A protein has these predicted regions:
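C-terminal output helix
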Residues: 108-117
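His-Asp phosphorelay/catalytic-motif detector in bacterial-type signaling
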Residues: 47-49, 74-79
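Active-site T/S-Asp motif of two-component receiver
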Residues: 52-54
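Acidic, metal-coordinating helix/loop segments flanking the phosphotransfer/catalytic sites
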Residues: 32-50
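Receiver (REC) domain active-site loop signature in two-component systems and cognate sites
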Residues: 57
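Charged docking surfaces used in two-component/phosphorelay signaling
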Residues: 17-25
């Protein structure tokens, strides 16, 4: 697998560690942030291939982070996975406006995260072939 870059943003050290290790072990390059402001700065500087962000973080929520990224040409197309214990509190309109690709409710397994990452980063042809199978 080519080394795709993933930014993982979560203020819970345990979740940040577990998700990062699972992704690194799968061959991804991982950068991490512990709050929304740091995640925004890293997204602008690093242009990751995918963002995994917690919904509830200090300084800026994951939803606000995604919304702000969509307003910048350089980051508007980065797919985003939202991690949340409050998945049902996010309004569908907010998710659509922030262009959140997927939501994973806590608790989740690292395998679920890796599966969703692979789905979102799969080449378009691979996705079409998988849907036809």
């Amino acid at each position: 697998m080519s080394s795709k870059k993933i930014l993982v943003a979560d203020d819970e050290a345990h979740i940040l560690h577990v998700v990062s290790m699972k992704l690194r072990n799968a061959g991804f390059e991982v950068i991490t942030a512990v709050d929304g402001e740091e995640a925004l700065e890293l997204c602008m500087a690093e242009k990751p291939d995918l963002l995994i962000t917690d919904f509830q973080m200090p300084l800026m929520t994951g939803l606000e982070l995604c919304t702000r990224l969509r307003g910048q040409e350089a980051t508007r197309d980065i797919p985003a996975i939202m991690l949340t214990a409050r998945g049902f509190d996010i309004e569908p309109e907010e998710m659509e406006a922030a262009r959140i690709s997927a939501v994973l409710a806590k608790p989740f397994s690292p395998r679920e995260v890796l599966q969703k990452v692979n789905e979102l980063l799969a080449p378009a042809g691979a996705k079409a072939g998988a849907e036809q199978a």
